[in-house]
Each structure stands twice: as C-alpha cells, then as structure tokens.
C-alpha cells in the first residue's frame, strides 16, 4: 500500500479518536493526498493537518460548501417529512442527515439526495399524490426499488432530489437474497424507531435493520460501480454509536440465509483494520487481512460513489463464469424492472425480452455512447471485482 493511502486512512481513522494520534504528512505526498481526499469528498478532514497556502483555500472552500449543502438538505428533509407526518404517512428516513448525526462533525459528511422508504402500498400511493400536490415533480427514471422526485426551492432556485423507496434495495438474481430482504423490511414485521437530529425527530430503521440495510446498500453499489470510503465511514461510525443496540446474531442469520456473509466479514474486518472500528464489536467475525487490503485498495481507487463509466452494465449478482446464460439472466431481470406488472405473465415474456433487448442496444449506443462489445467487456471486469467478496458464494444459481 502506498504511503499516501496509509496516511489518508490514518487521517480518516483519527476523525473519531480521542485524543487523536499523531499523523505526519511528508511534503511530497500532499498533492496526491489532496487529490485522493477530493475524489472521496473528504477534503475537510484534512484541515487539521494541512495549512499550506497552496491547498488551504481549497479545503476551506469545500468545507463551506458542505456546510451550506448540509443546511439545505436538512431543510429539504424537514419539508418532506412534515408533509408526510401531517397526513400520518409512515416512513423511514434512510442515510442522509440520519447518518451525518453519527459523525463527530455532521456537516463534513457529503450529502446528495434524500432517501425515504415507505413499505405500505396504500401509504405509498397517498404519498405520491401529496408530493405532486406540493410541487414535487416525478422524474422519468427506470428503477426496480424507488421513484425519483425533484423539487425546486423558489427562493434560491436550487433543485433537490427525493428517492422514494418502495423496496429497500434493488433486486438480485439470487432469489433467496431477495426473499430475506423482503422479509426483514416488510410492513408486517418492520417497526420504526425515532432519531432526533438538531431538535427534530425522524422515523428511522431500528439499529439491527439499519445495519443490514447499509450492507445491502454497499453491496448494490459495489456490484454496480464500486463505492468510496464514505460508505465504510458510515458503517464504522454507525456501529460505534449503536453497537449495544444491534443484534449481531440476527445479522449473522440474515447474511447467512441471503449468502452475503463473506461480504459482511470483509466489510467489518476492513473497518477494524483501517477505520478504527473496535475489535470488541462482533468479535467472532474475522477475515483474511490480505483480502481486506485488496478490498480497501479497490475502494480507494474508486471515486466517492464508485467509478461509473459510460459502458457500465449493472450486474445483479456475482458469477463464477460469464456465459450466454448469464446475459440472459441479467436481461430477464431487467425485463421485470422495465415491465413490473405485465412481466408477471409468462406468456408475454418472449415479446418483453425482445423489447428489453431493443432498449438495451439503443441505450448502449445513444445514452452510454459506447459499443455492445465494450459494455459486455466492462461487465466481465465488474464481475471479476465481485469475486473478491464471494457474494452469494459466487453462485450461478
């Protein structure tokens, strides 16, 4: 591991250490360190260590922008939940300011859109109507687990996005994993808990379910395009705060049944080795340090939310080998995403497969602006990356 990587990880680890450990930054690695922190949206964390006139204005500017963005996203979140709570619509706030609150300096965690989960179908339909009545605009986006709404604040002209989840995460090819996720986060079983952020109470997932959700959120990003250090920081800080409230045996059971236990192991051990997660949290879980180093290097080589290229093809699982049947399975899943209702009728599948393939080819050349060959090659490469985490035991089931 390069010196810049080691130094960067020590700085991240220091965020929540009291007292912080001494970190020495050799002058020759400062440019690379600033570039790395910029890619991972963590520039403000360098402020205690770098005061060079060459870099300090950039660090301060980024810190101010993140502070402003935090305030705006917090107001956006308050607006949405006030609309729902006024009409007694049950919801779960995912990530966002809920996770920021676990950081020593909440404003230094990058925020994007707002994610809310509604697992009750009648409540979801009511929420959609309310959003439309309150100036939210539904975006034309194909997703198997959420709807995207935009809202523009008249006073400042800023447009913010809301992802309204009707499933907690996207579908996998591996059906048992989908079944476990649906069971854990179903309306009949899942109970909300309250979290107070800056004096305002929000409904959030209970700690055990929140931990399981974060694992699946990271897994989906990893299978798609990878992810940056922020998601590992989220996981680390959340577990540090809520470890006593988390039922780790249930986490083990859910991960085992959905066959993502190896992913949980490498995440937990990597957070211990590189981000300061205490060894006392779920101590029975261990993983090979060499694999963890390879994993963290993959994380550091990506951007904040992964490396999205124009020829990315989203994979819903990990395969021992890529065959024509693999592409057919992925295409079949995309058919269900594109046609969630009529896709339930097997008699229509042949026609829907053809339509799905037509849109895939069209999007490859017109939207992704690449070739079919390059897209499939990138899919091969993405599958190679997923072998490290042994997801679904790399099953072709």
List the predicted regions and their residue ranges.
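Conserved NTP-donor binding/palm subdomain of two-metal-ion nucleotidyltransferases/polymerases, i.e.
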Residues: 1-112, 118-397
């Amino acid at each position: 591991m390069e010196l810049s990587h080691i130094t960067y990880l020590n700085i991240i680890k220091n965020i929540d250490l009291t007292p912080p450990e001494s970190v020495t930054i050799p002058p020759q690695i400062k440019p690379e360190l600033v570039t790395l922190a910029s890619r991972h949206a963590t520039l403000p964390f360098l402020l205690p260590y770098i005061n060079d006139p060459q870099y300090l204005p950039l660090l301060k500017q980024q810190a101010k922008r993140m502070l402003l963005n935090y305030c705006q996203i917090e107001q956006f979140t308050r607006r949405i939940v006030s609309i729902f709570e006024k009409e007694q619509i049950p919801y779960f706030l995912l990530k966002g300011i809920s996770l920021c609150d676990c950081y020593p300096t909440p404003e230094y965690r990058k925020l994007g859109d707002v994610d809310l989960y509604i697992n009750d179908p009648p409540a979801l339909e009511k929420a959609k109507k309310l959003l439309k009545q309150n100036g939210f605009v539904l975006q034309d986006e194909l997703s198997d687990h959420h709807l995207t709404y935009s809202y523009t604040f008249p006073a400042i002209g800023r447009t913010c996005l809301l992802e309204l989840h009707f499933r907690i995460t996207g579908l996998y090819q591996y059906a048992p994993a989908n079944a476990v996720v649906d069971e854990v986060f179903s309306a009949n079983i899942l109970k909300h808990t309250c979290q107070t952020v800056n004096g305002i109470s929000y409904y959030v997932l209970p700690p055990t379910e929140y931990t399981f959700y974060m694992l699946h959120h990271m897994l989906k990003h990893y299978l798609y395009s990878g992810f940056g250090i922020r998601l590992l920081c989220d996981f680390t800080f959340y577990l540090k705060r809520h470890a006593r409230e988390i039922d780790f045996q249930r986490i083990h059971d859910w991960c085992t049944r959905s066959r993502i236990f190896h992913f949980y192991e490498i995440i937990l051990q990597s957070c211990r080795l590189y981000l300061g997660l205490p060894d006392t949290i779920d101590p029975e879980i261990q993983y090979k340090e060499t694999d963890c180093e390879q994993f963290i290097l993959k994380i550091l080589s990506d951007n904040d939310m992964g490396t999205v290229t124009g020829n990315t093809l989203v994979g819903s699982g990990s395969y021992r080998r890529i065959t024509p049947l693999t592409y057919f399975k992925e295409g079949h899943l995309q058919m269900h995403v594109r046609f969630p209702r009529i896709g339930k009728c097997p008699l229509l599948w042949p026609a829907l497969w053809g339509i799905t393939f037509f849109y895939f080819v069209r999007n490859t050349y017109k939207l992704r602006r690449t070739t079919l060959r390059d897209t499939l090659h990138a899919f091969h490469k993405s599958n190679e990356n997923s072998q490290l985490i042994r997801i679904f035991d790399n099953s072709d089931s």
